[in-house]
Amino acid sequence: MDVLRNVLGYDDADLDTEMTALGQRIDIAVKHNGKVLLVIELKNVRHKLPTAVREQAANYAASKSADWTVVTNGQVWKLYRIIPVKGHDPQIVEVFDIALFDDDGLSDNDIACFYLLTKRALTGSDSERRFHLKESLNDRRILAAINDEKIVKAMSKLLATTYRQENKVNVKLSSEDVRARLEDLFRPEDL
């Protein structure tokens, strides 16, 4: 609770430790203007954070119409964006997974991610922007972009041009050549 108050900027009125969801007590519900912003599921520092804990927190958050959930053992902090899906379990999208005081100490990335948990970031648009940035660059989208016909064609031209400049030899590369090489680099089902 001290971290939430002293580091992340929440007032006592923002923090609810008595709220229930799905017949269970929520460890901490972070509220703003009466709306639940964030559900925090706390575990002992000696415990790992398995998928079941993430799903439990996400279901609590969805039941309270909260967009965000955090699971933490104090050392590891994981922020998820919760997207309701009518008639199904909510979609859970990881925004970050950081370990405080690990081999890299308290890194700049840890600090930047931890900022996303602040009242300012959650009530403003910083956390939402970070979620959209991460989603726009997810593996599926990157692989789809790489495999787009225009990109493959541009890659074949660029590869042939740079090879010619470096080796003084003309090589004809087709889109099919590049696509075959991409399949070698990535699993075909990824493309």
Across the structure, where does each feature detected by a protein language model lie?
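A short, conserved, highly charged catalytic patch centered on acidic carboxylates
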Residues: 1-68, 79-191
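Acidic beta-strand-to-loop metal/phosphate-binding motif
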Residues: 71-72
